[in-house]
């Protein structure tokens, strides 16, 4: 689905969302009449420092705002230009992610919706930083592609390709990401999205459950147990 189709299905009665220069911003009415803030990246646009600080600013603009946030993502990776790197790209991306963490901690639901491509730091700082991540069929997320992993780890690409067949954490793609627990659910584009969004918002926020989801789905069998053990040891040490 394209962003125009998604917005039409989310807000059948109309919305105040605009898409300019790859940036999505505005708001739309939920089925109960309240409003949801809509932000994001469109058209496979790379996420640079100007975009990251602008998105964070939209989230932080009004400290009294309690609208939930929907982050629509169809991006390239982060913009790895000289200017962005020299000005501290990683800090800008971290600031955007932490803006969402803050919103979630203050009672604003943050929902990431993957509908196109996204990769690397752009993915981590936007949709993956949301409290809940959902997707539409055809989304193409990748934290790092296998050739890049090969360059970093010095492992042969053939070896990584074999590992990816059995270990979802090594493999890009929506199905693998869902197996690890990162994606809560994949929405059905044949049904109105406004109802699926309403159902999600009706569920109480349950904190970060990605490790337990990954264990249940077989994509990350150890993460939940290790996290629990670390927690128990920390408590024991006072």
Annotated model-derived regions:
Residues 26-52:
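STAS-typified acidic loop motif
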Residues 44-45, 78, 117:
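Short strand->helix junction
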Residues 1-15, 152, 157-238:
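Amphipathic alpha-helical segments at domain termini/boundaries
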Residues 81-188, 195:
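Conserved catalytic cores of soluble enzyme domains
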Residues 34-40, 54-82:
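A structural preference for short, pocket-lining loop segments at secondary-structure junctions
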Residues 55-56, 128-130, 201-203:
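Short, solvent-exposed amphipathic alpha-helical segments in soluble enzyme
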Residues 14-32:
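N-terminal short beta-loop-beta anion/metal-coordinating cradle
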């Amino acid at each position: 689905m394209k962003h125009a189709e998604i917005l039409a299905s989310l807000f059948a009665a109309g919305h105040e969302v605009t898409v300019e220069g790859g940036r999505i911003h505005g708001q739309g009415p939920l089925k109960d009449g309240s409003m949801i803030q809509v932000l994001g990246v469109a058209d496979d646009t790379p996420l640079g420092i100007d975009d990251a600080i602008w998105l964070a600013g939209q989230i932080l603009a009004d400290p009294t705002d309690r609208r939930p946030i929907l982050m629509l993502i169809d991006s390239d990776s982060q913009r790895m230009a000289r200017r962005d790197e020299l000005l501290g790209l990683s800090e800008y991306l971290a600031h955007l992610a932490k803006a969402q963490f803050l919103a979630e901690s203050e009672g604003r639901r943050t929902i990431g919706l993957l509908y196109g491509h996204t990769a690397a730091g752009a993915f981590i700082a936007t949709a993956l930083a949301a409290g809940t991540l959902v997707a539409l069929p055809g989304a193409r997320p990748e934290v790092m592609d296998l050739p890049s992993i090969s360059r970093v780890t010095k492992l042969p690409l053939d070896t990584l390709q074999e590992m990816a067949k059995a270990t979802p954490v090594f493999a890009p793609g929506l199905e693998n990401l869902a197996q690890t627990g990162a994606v809560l659910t994949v929405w059905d584009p044949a049904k109105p999205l406004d109802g699926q969004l309403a159902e999600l918002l009706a569920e109480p926020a349950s904190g970060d459950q990605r490790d337990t989801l990954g264990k249940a789905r077989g994509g990350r069998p150890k993460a939940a147990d290790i996290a629990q053990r670390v927690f128990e040891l920390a408590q024991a040490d006072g």
